[in-house]
Amino acid sequence: KEISKYAKTVMVRTNLVILAVPAYRDIPELYRDLKVQIVASLPYYNEKVVNKQRGKGVFPKSIEVLQRLNELGYGKEEDLVINLVYNPNGAYLPPKQEALEKTYKKKLFDNFGIVFNNLFAITNNPIGRFSEFLHREDLYADYMNKLFRAYNPATLPGLMCRNMISIGPDGSLYDCDFNLIEKLNVSGEIQHVSQLTKEHIGVRRIRTGMHCYGCTAGAGSS
């Protein structure tokens, strides 16, 4: 509620299933009232694939939440935006976003009556559990070489770190969602969301790492 008073656009990243938990079932109404943009993870439009990747029961819960968000106007009203996120289930780059988005929209609407605004096909960044998987399977070097070869300088102007600020659960500020996972706070004196109520964060040096190649590969991932 507080940050929406100061930010022109507020976006929240969600795995959807958390919004099916009784303690959080009123959150979608809050998002609607504040016009919060929702970025929701849905690994695939097929139950078998999603349940294999995320666990049994995740897909039907995700569908239930998406249908509820549609009922609230998300994906239908101009100022209630919901975008879905696709990640490859392995050490490879995502397919072309435009074609995949068309398939997602057709499958979800035909099978469940679900509508959404856009699909983001995001490259798996070599951080967190995915990094652990790559090292465990001895795939890290090969995967990084894929990212290096797919580097596209045309993606740089649209990177999230150049246009947005990510806020951690404790209010700490990060250049992007991936730096949040890596606990790489923004550079400069302003480090907490409470400071943004008094002054703008201004120009700063973006903190980077090897994981940044995930956002600059192919058509870009942020």
Residue spans of the language-model regions?
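A structural signal for short, well-ordered beta-strand segments and their strand-loop junctions
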Residues: M11, V39-S41, V81-V85, N118-A121, ...
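Flexible mid-to-C-terminal extensions adjoining Fe-S/redox cofactors in radical SAM and related proteins
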Residues: S172-S222
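C-terminal accessory regions of radical SAM enzymes
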Residues: F148-E182
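Core AdoMet radical
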Residues: K1-Y24, P28-Q67, N83
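Short secondary-structure boundary/capping segments
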Residues: P28-L30, P157, R204
